[in-house]
Amino acid sequence: MPDSRTLWTAVVIICIAVSVFFSVKKRTTFKRLQQLMAAKQWDEFDRLLDGKLTSMLYPRYNRDYLRLNSYLLREDHERASEMFDLLLGLNLPKMQRVDLVIKAFNYYVGQEDRKKSKELLHEIKGFEGGQAEAVAHECQLMYDTMILKRHNDIPELERMLEDVGDDPVKRCRLEYLLALQYQNTGDEAKFQEFLEKSGQHSMAVNA
């Protein structure tokens, strides 16, 4: 009969093997989910995301966050809004909350949903630490431009664009806001100019 030391060694080996298995499956499952989203194979994506193994590998929030991203890619606005409502109603750690609120704000601003955008902007202005003030200011610019249809921030946006350097992500965002502000003034030429520049930087980011 095996002694306790042998049994303990066997248990440790089994635990390590199980840990390695789940670690590998977690990576491969996530990669597969990303591939299915990129290919827009939504039926297969839903089956994998709702499968028992995926439920064991990932917490509910992570799965629902992936589900939200899929609804955004599908442009299924009804289910995306339902998922935002569900996730925003959870008691989340600070960083998860910040990430989700900003994501929701960007979505609702894009949908020109004034009520929800305003509520989320109010919460964003209450964030503290790190780049909170800069993020809140940029979100205010987005709200003013896309919801209130203002154009009085053009000088500030042009200064920000001069100071941002070669960062394609920031340039893309600022150029897009400038395009919209010029559109709000009725300047079609400037709108097209900055929209084209924003598109070029967007392609550079996604290349």
Question: Would you name each region that the model predicts?
Answer:
Residues 36, 71, 108, 144-148, ...:
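Residue at a conserved register position within TPR or TPR-like alpha-solenoid repeats
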Residues 44-52, 77-89, 113-128, 150-165, ...:
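Alpha-helical repeat scaffolds
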Residues 22-96, 111:
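N-terminal topogenic membrane-targeting module
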Residues 98-120:
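A membrane-cytosol interface segment of integral membrane proteins
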Residues 175-207:
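Alpha-helical oligomerization segments
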Residues 21-31, 56-65, 93-102, 130-141, ...:
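Generic helix N-cap/helix-start motif at coil->alpha-helix transitions
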Residues 1-30:
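N-terminal signal-anchor transmembrane alpha helix of single-pass membrane proteins
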